[in-house]
Each structure stands twice: as C-alpha cells, then as structure tokens.
Amino acid sequence: MRSNGCGDLRKDSIDAVVQLCGWVDRRRDHGGVIFIDLRDRSGTVQITVDPDLGAEAFAVAEHLRSETVLQVHGKVRARPAESLNDKLATGAVEVLASEIVVLNKVTGNLPFPVSVHDEENTREELRLRHRYLDLRRKRMNDNLRLRARTIQAARRFLEDEGFIEVETPVLTRSTPEGARDYVLPSRVCGGDWFALPQSPQLFKQLLMVGGIERYYQVARCFRDEDLRADRQPEFTQLDIEMSFMGEEQILQLNEDLICAIWKSVKGIELPRPFPRMTWHDAMERYGTDRPDTRYGMELVTVSDIVQDMGFKVFSGAVKSGGSVKVIAVPGGNDALSNVRIKPGGDVFSEAQAAGAGGLAFIRVRDGGEIDTIGAIKDNLSDEQKAELLKRTGATPGTLLLFGAGETAIVNKALDRVRQYLAKELNLVKPDRQNDAWNFLWVVDFPMFEFNSDENRYEALHHPFCAPNTDDLGSDPAQWATTLPKARAQAYDLVLNGLELGGGSLRIHDSALQRQVLQTVGLPLEEAQAQFGFLINALDMGAPPHGGLAFGVDRMVMLLAGEDSIRDTIAFPKTQQARCLMTDAPSSVAEKQLQELHVSSTWVDPAEDEN
C-alpha cells in the first residue's frame, strides 16, 4: 500500500517514484497549484498537486479536508530554493502527485485541530475524550515511541545481566499492605473476592524463594487512591528482584540500569556515582524525603537561637517540642513584596495549604542590616541577628522565611514554599545540562512510624522491608524502646524532586517476619491468615534477597519533559479515575450482578436530595 514513510524522504530520494499513505495535516491552495502536508507517524512531507501534470489528482485535492486519509502516488523532486523549509526533516524535497486515492473521509466536525501548528490550544478534557485523535499528534506520538524505547532499553540491560522476565498474577487476594485495593467478585467462588495487585511485591519474593534469583517484569499495578498529576489508578512498574546481593550491589546495578536507559534514550552520559543522602538529612535540610537538589534554599534549623526570645510564635513552638526553621531566598527582597508573604498573598497561601498558620520573615538589607516588622523586630537581640546571619549564610538582598510549629508541618510547609519559589524565581533551568538530571539516593529510612490516631506503629514503606537489626536488637522484648530509631534497609531513587523508584532488602527469616507483622498491629492468627503463604515459604530456605521498582510512567514523563504522566500513557484516566473516551467505569446489568452474588447500595446524591 505504501513504499515509504512520509517523514523518511530526503535529498537522496530525489527522482524516486513513491507511494505514501497518511493524513492531511494542512491543505493550501495557491491559485492553480495545491499543496498538501501529508503526515504519518514518521513525519510530514509536502505534496504538490499541479493540474497540468495530474488533472484527476488535482480534482481530488480541491475538496480535501484536514485528517482525510490518503494514498498518494508520485515522484520525489527537489523543492525550489525559495520554498525550502528547514523546520521539516523533509523540507528539501516534495512529492509531485500523479494520483491521489481517498482511503477514508472525515464525515463530521473535528472536535479540535490535530495539526502540529494548533497543538497547544486544546483543553485536556477534549484531548482525553477523543484520544484517538490526540494520539495522531506529533507530541503524543513521540511520547509513546519514547516510552517504548525506554522499556526496550531496560529489557536489554536486564537480559544482559542475567535477569528473567516473569509474569505474576493479576487476579490475587486482597492484603492490608498499602493503599486501597481494587477488588473483583468471583462468580465461581460466591462471596469471595479477587484483588488487583498494587505491586508484585509478594510474588516476586516467592520467585526468589523459588530459586529464580534474578527477576524483572514490566508490571501493571492498580491502586484505588486519590489522584494527582503524577498518579493513575492503573500504572506501570519496572519491577526488579534479586537474590544473594547486598544493598550496595543493588544500588550499583540499578545505577547502571538508569545510566543505560538515559544513554539509549537521550544520548546522555550521566555522572556517576549518584549522590546519597540519609532520610534524616533529607528531612532536616529539605523537609521532604524527595528533595530537589538542583537549587539551594535549604531548610536551616534555628530553634536554639530563637527559643528564648519574646516572640511567642517561635518560643512556644520550641517549648511544645516543635521546631523553628528558615529558608534563605537569594534576591528575595526585590522579588517578593510583603503583600505576597502576608495573609492573602501567594507565598503565604502555599504555606497555609501545607497546614502552616503562616510565615514570619526578615529582610537582609545592604550592609547586613536586618529589617523586619512587628513582634520579631521588638524581640530579636543583636546577638540573635548575628547568629541568624551566620547560620543561614544570608547576604544583602536575601529574604529569610521562617516556619514555626510542629516539625512535620514546618517541614511540609517550607518544602512547598521552597518548590514554589524555585519556579517563581526561575531557579531551575532544565536547558542547562547540569541542571537537568539531579539523581539522588535517599537511604536509611525509618522502619516504622507512629500513628497517633490509632496509637500504634506502622511500616513506613511496607512490613516486608528488612530492618536494620543492629538498631532493633535481637530480642523482640527490647523493641519497645528501639522502634522509634530503627532504620529499614530501604532506599529511594529521587530525580529532580520526584521519586523515580524505591525498594529495600526483604525479610527472609520467618520469625522476624512474624514479629514485624505483630509490631504493625497484625496478631499472629491474622498474620497467618493474610500472609501465611509468604511466611510458610520463608520457612523453606528463603535466600537473602532485595529489589526495587521504578515508576515507568513517571520515568517517561521526565524523559519527555512533560508535566503529567497522562501525556505519556496512551489511554489514561482523569483525576476522577474516569476514562472520558469510553465512559468507564460504568454500570452493569442487574443480571451480571446476580451472577456475581453482589448488589449495589450506591445512591446517587443528586437523586437522594430529590
């Protein structure tokens, strides 16, 4: 049907007779000669239709609409010098059409223009509702091809390293290991339910017990959770697990993998080794376990400096066990007015959205003088001023922004403000090579975190992470005192402030696994009922093992320079977990519900009000 791709023609194609297929991107009538930009996934080429050289082709071309599907027969020739187009890879040539066949017409009105010239002005809702049209666009086509190259590069690397691709079940049982499950009723086993996997975590551990030793999978995963720009209810992980390797070996191998992907997909040699930072340092310096290290404005703790001052917001925070922290904003004096920092201002609103009551601020003037207002001004001694300048490294023109209160809220608020100001002040310049890819390993996560609402400890990652036994101690009777400081042998790979992947060494001792499950609130009987298959497997000579999973959607988003993973997935859901194109999820017939032995108690709120 076709001999060449539209985007494949170059100067060395001149005089070749070709047959092309594609969509009409644009049509231009120049008074006697018609020009058609014909597009397929390889690119776009100009078709010239001259009535003197192809009357029938010209008659067809006179009535063509955008997105009509064509087959064009013609001869490649050089473009005249005045019509060369250096914006197109095919811009040095054109095809003189001798025959045009309409393969399919557009019979209705297009919901939006598909041409690359009009891409930027279409609402996302329309794009998702008519995704089949959106996929014709160069941007989306390029993103999906980049996604395919990313997965291919990962597969090549892992196969060369002796890994085996193994598929794990999609229909499994619900286990209390993380977010809310998607569940499916069983028709055959009435009253019982399957769950879609949130990850292949337990199955990949069982593969290690089974002697596979090196496993990987491009795995589909499902989580029924609130969505945002970089989350979907169904998503893809590059899942990896290996036996007889320590944490250092696992980190090195996965660095090699990431470097291989970036080299293959972007042609970039990433600097090695990736920097490392403990979880504690990340929280202390950035207020988050996913720090963006492309710019400064690190959090600085100043609780000891201000704890005795008369400003009760500061002193009260310290006395109640909280913190006072500050970020130094270079050039902030000129860039940020008082109005923006006070209630109602955009910077204040960012802190408030993270749970903070507000922000205090100090301006460093020329000569190092400190300028502030209100209670801070009246209660800050010269010694405290000098110590603040010394600790923050503030220079003239710097704005100091303070957060005070519960440490977790202070961290969250200043982290959010820091990220917001980095964009506002253009501190991130991704066009510069050294700013584009800041990888960071975050290590030594806490094993447990305390849930004050339920008055119990929970696993920070999941209860299958191997704890640092030096922290916990060998006697579980001592754990009551060691739990708060116990570290997990866990690690996350962060890229430009986003978590790219994470993993850990796993518990491979059944007694330790039982104890950890008990610690997070699962009695022995319940632990056996929920995870007995895993615990029994650990009793059968489980090897030491560990692994990691990368978020493929997020990785491709970063490689493509997109802001949302929806632009790297062929058919994504909205933030309400709906598919606008197919109108899924949808209701099902009552007969289907009866076959599944279930009934719906859902009441439409709108109908209920009536």
UniProtKB/Swiss-Prot annotation:
Q: Which GO terms describe its biological process?
A: aspartyl-tRNA aminoacylation
Top enzyme category: ligase
CDD domains per the record?
A: AspRS_core, EcAspRS_like_N
Query: Which positions in this protein are listed as binding ATP?
Result: R223, D224, E225, Q232, E499, G551, V552, D553, R554
One annotated GO molecular function is: aspartate-tRNA ligase activity
Which cysteine pairs make disulfide bonds? none
Question: What SUPFAM superfamilies does the record tag this protein with?
Answer: Class II aaRS and biotin synthetases (SSF55681), GAD domain-like (SSF55261), Nucleic acid-binding proteins (SSF50249)
Site positions (Important for tRNA non-discrimination) are H30
Gene3D superfamilies membership: Bira Bifunctional Protein, Domain 2, GAD-like domain, Nucleic acid-binding proteins
Q: What is its EC number?
A: 6.1.1.23
| GO CC annotations, alphabetized | cytoplasm
Task: Give the matching HAMAP family.
Answer: Asp_tRNA_synth_type1
Family, according to the entry, reads as follows:
Belongs to the class-II aminoacyl-tRNA synthetase family. Type 1 subfamily.
UniProt subunit comment: Homodimer.
This protein is called: Aspartate--tRNA(Asp/Asn) ligase
**What is the species of this protein?**
Synechococcus sp. (strain CC9902)
